[in-house]
């Protein structure tokens, strides 16, 4: 029997470090808990990184930097409301700079889906989902959205937050 199943963002991440150890980052109680382990799996360090907005999107442990994505609801459907924040950290999780996205046809960020990131050629690619502004049928439909951010200065290079496949549904 089918019962409303929704996707959600991943809260726990694990990556191997250059020295053969591991770094674990997990979103718990409005903060990112970062633990570093040596190659024998002994805890070397632990750090808490405060969430910057109320809704957690995801983490990316990159080659030279780490990234976290946060968001917040936009109940007024205001194009001036910050709905996504992409934050760049150094490899020790010290905050460096952010990229803010406002409006973006977003009522609720990350709703009913996940978030994935990758990097290549100095660009950070973020693919996630959102519940969009109310449509003519009176509903807030869910859809995918994508962003490309320049890693050096964290400027937004490209984004897509519109409605796809109008004739077939929302994807």
Go through each PLM region and give its residues.
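Beta-strand-rich domains and repeat architectures in extracellular enzymes and scaffolds
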Residues: 1-32, 51-53
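A short beta-strand motif characteristic of beta-propeller blades
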Residues: 1-5, 42-49, 95-107, 155-162
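Repeated scaffold domains used in trafficking and secretory/extracellular systems
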Residues: 7-16, 52-62, 106-117, 161-171
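Beta-propeller blade signature
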Residues: 34-37, 81-93, 139-154
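Blade-loop segments of beta-propeller domains
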Residues: 43-75, 82, 100-105
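Acidic, serine/threonine- and glycine-rich low-complexity intrinsically disordered segments
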Residues: 127-171
